[in-house]
Amino acid sequence: MEKKQSILSPIIRITFTFLVLCGLVYPLIVTGIAQAVMKDNADGSLIYNDKNEVIGSKLIGQNFTDPRYFQGRVSSIEYKAEASGSNNYAPSNPDLAKRVEKSIADWKEKNPAVPVTEIPIDLVTNSGSGLDPDISPKAASVQVDRISKLTNIPKEKLNQLIKDQTEGAALGLFGETRVNVLKLNLALQKLMK
């Protein structure tokens, strides 16, 4: 009986020690460092309105249905963060072709002046998470005609807005040139006032 107790005692102590270290101490240290070094990112890169209410995050896409605003990427999960992920079909999968064809038809319905050959791929395909907040500058530019007609804002102003909101690759190396749709639409909203 004593031998069992002598074997179990260190096992229980080690288990409890690692439970406290990995489940409490480490997360608190990492959270503290994140809050000190990059508070905005640690809090989810939230964007607030004039009333200090959260209206979105720079990191999570939103579904903009009003045709006066720029539209983001297609999301098979309807931008529900708790259901993150998409059906990442292989290029040879017929379901991918059907989904893209449906996305093109939906997009053409809202933007009849844009030829199918000029629709950027990021407007008719999902991102891996289904929550991508960014589109390419070209994807924003092809929407200028529609938005200009609906808002009476000159195309030149809208193109300048896109240029002002365009972000380069991270550190000049990683990723593509992109436009955050939420930030772009907030800037557009200021022009509409």
UniProtKB/Swiss-Prot annotation:
Topology term for the membrane: Single-pass membrane protein
The places in or outside the cell where this protein is found are: Cell membrane
A GO cellular component entry from the record: plasma membrane
**Disulfide connectivity?**
none
InterPro entries in the cross-refs: KdpC
- A Pfam family found in this protein is KdpC
Query: To which protein family does this belong?
Result: Belongs to the KdpC family.
Q: How does it assemble?
A: The system is composed of three essential subunits: KdpA, KdpB and KdpC.
Q: What does this protein do?
A: Part of the high-affinity ATP-driven potassium transport (or Kdp) system, which catalyzes the hydrolysis of ATP coupled with the electrogenic transport of potassium into the cytoplasm. This subunit acts as a catalytic chaperone that increases the ATP-binding affinity of the ATP-hydrolyzing subunit KdpB by the formation of a transient KdpB/KdpC/ATP ternary complex.
Q: What is this protein called?
A: Potassium-transporting ATPase KdpC subunit
| UniProt lineage | Bacteria, Bacillati, Bacillota, Bacilli, Bacillales
State the gene name recorded for this protein: kdpC
